[in-house]
Amino acid sequence: VQIVQATIETLAEIGYSRASFSAICRQARLSSTGMISYYFSGKPELFRKAAQSVLAESEAAMAECVARETTYRAKLGAYIVAQITFVTRRPTQTQALAEIVAMVQARQISGLDDVARAALSVDSLTELLEQGRQAGEFHTLDARLMALVIHSAIENVVRHHCLQDGDGDPEPYARRLADIFDRCIAAR
């Protein structure tokens, strides 16, 4: 756990190109890089564990918020708010995951395509939208396309918040965005 957390912090702080075992070792306050090599066969395995840790934390936060709601419209709103809140309140984890995805996309590391796909996936959101449509809460829509649109909007709200209002509360943006999508896709 200590090594994985140090990996997340190192990736976020100095980026994947400089995230060596030595840098991670310093961050973890370990006496030797051999301790990392003992537990992990190489960077791909270590970065996989780091990404899985961030994804599990994000998914747990999302699931908890969504599960509290009883309607699909409310679940969608909770999903949007939880996503924006997680990303803006956990910038170290978010940046580390972004670094890993960028590494995979740039083909600078192999064996992590599944991790990058999981990080960029809109499958759970697509499923939520499809269930809401089937329950009659959302109008007829292409659930996958709408999930991609919502995902892009979330990314842009986060980017705007971080660049413009970095110290401000992200929740008002999140709630307004959730309201916009609710009005757009609610059954009439």
Say what each PLM segment does:
Residues 2, 10-45, 49:
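Helix-turn-helix
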Residues 85, 122-134, 152-188:
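C-terminal peripheral helix-coil segments that are non-catalytic and often amphipathic
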Residues 88-109, 163:
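Amphipathic alpha-helical segments used for helix-helix packing
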